[in-house]
Each structure stands twice: as C-alpha cells, then as structure tokens.
Amino acid sequence: MIEKTGNILDSSADALVNPVNCVGVSGAGLAKAIAQRYPRWAAAYKAAARRGDIRIGYVWRHAADVAFDAPLIYALPTKRHWREPSRLEDVAAGLEALAVDVCHSEFPPTSLALPAVGCGLGSLPWGQVRPLIEAAAEKMDRSGVTVYLYPPGAL
C-alpha cells in the first residue's frame, strides 16, 4: 500500500473506489465528484441502486465510461441512506467484499485508488477505519494489486 496525497480523481490507478450509499444518490463529496466526471457511471450506479444491486457488504463495479483510459470504478456502500452516518461494521464488510472481488477477479486491476471510506461525510474516525483499509490492502497487495491510499482530506 502506498499513501498518496492530492485529488484521487487524478490518480493513474486502473481502478478507484467510490464510497456510496445504497439509494443511488451522489449529492456530495467524492461520490458527487465522480458523478460529475463520469455521468454514464453515475446513471448506471443509480439504476443499480433502484434494482437493489447496491447493498452493504457487497461491491458493484462498472467501467467509468466507454473511453479507453477511463478507470474501473468500484462502488463500495458505506451508508445505507445518504442521510445516515456510516457504520464501522458496514465499512468493514465492504472492504472485505472489495478485497475478495479484486483478488478473485478474472481480470483484476493492477492498481487501485482507495479513499478513506466512511470517514468524510460518513463521520467515522480515521483511526478506526485505517486498520480495516490496511487489512484489505494487504490482501490485494499479496494478489499483485498496488493499492494507493488517499487519507482524509485528499478529496
């Protein structure tokens, strides 16, 4: 795991993690920034939420856009509803699901940009979330995926 600073959207990683809610709203924070940059991804995420495909303890992955250089984006639900704070157990379940999906994918990304999921608008303390991220990143690192961690404040 390599700690980074700056805007996660400027990362050169093949894939990035978007902390989302289960109702399909991308109204603030990184989710909003991703929705603005990749409107096709945002529309697909919203449709997936309406279908019930966005659930705590699962990740949903989808290409950001049809452009060749667009990243794969993993939606990692950290909130059941956008009005609620994140729950540590939900973030833990999501990170475990992310590690399993990345490690067992037929075509895994070679690199993954991972923000401080659940910490910003989710209101969880970084000191509690960081060990969960480190554990998931270690599993992905062992599978050959370089994880770039963007701590709180990176965007």
Predicted segments, located by residue:
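Macrodomain-like recognition of ADP-ribose-binding/processing modules
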Residues: 1-155
